[in-house]
């Protein structure tokens, strides 16, 4: 249930290196948007106040068929064109949604889906380490 998920959210931690990557992206004055199927309160609980403050746009509770719409909304709110953005995701539907919107997509192998599943969907980038994020952002 949602209540149980919220109660257990304090045990969820960011993957090592994600915090420093978010800080480095923010230092470059790059807008950060979070588009997720999760609820906002859960996202804020995991990020904490400091990291949440680096995020320009939150689009939460994105369903299977609404992720592309939420991505478009996040771009509009951030004032960013699809070709100027990069989507980072850990599921095949993240790749599909980014494609629908025209955003280059980077699939990360340390999350939900197995790397072979992600590779099959042919993302623009397949990242095996958080350290690779800044190389993509710098392009």
Question: Over which residues does each language-model region extend?
Answer:
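Acidic, Mg2+-coordinating phosphoryl-transfer loop and its flanking beta/alpha structural elements
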Residues: 86-128
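Core-facing hydrophobic residues within beta-strands of well-ordered domains
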Residues: 22, 54-55, 82
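Conserved Lys-Pro-Asp/Glu-containing loop-to-beta segment of HAD-superfamily phosphomonoesterases
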Residues: 68-96
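Short, basic/glycine-rich phosphate-binding loops at helix/coil junctions
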Residues: 1-5, 50-56
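Phosphate- and divalent-cation-binding pockets in alpha/beta enzyme and binding domains
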Residues: 42-45, 70, 97, 117, ...
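A short, structured active-site edge motif that brings together acidic residues
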Residues: 52-66
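Short beta->alpha linker loops
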Residues: 13-17, 38-39, 62, 66, ...
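Short, acidic loop-to-helix structural element flanking the phosphoryl-transfer center
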Residues: 6-34, 40-44, 68-69
């Amino acid at each position: 249930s949602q209540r149980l998920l919220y109660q257990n959210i304090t045990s969820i931690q960011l993957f090592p290196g994600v915090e420093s990557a978010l800080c480095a992206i923010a230092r470059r004055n790059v807008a950060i948007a979070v588009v997720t199927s999760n609820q906002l309160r859960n996202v804020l609980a995991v990020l904490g106040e400091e990291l949440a403050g680096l995020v320009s746009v939150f689009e939460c509770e994105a369903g299977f068929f609404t992720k592309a719409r939420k991505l478009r909304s996040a771009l509009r709110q951030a004032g960013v064109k699809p070709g100027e953005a990069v989507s980072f995701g850990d599921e095949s539907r993240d790749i599909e949604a980014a494609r629908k919107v025209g955003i280059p997509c980077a699939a990360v192998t340390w999350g939900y889906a197995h790397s072979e599943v992600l590779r099959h969907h042919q993302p623009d980038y397949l990242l095996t380490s958080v350290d690779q994020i800044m190389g993509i952002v710098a392009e």
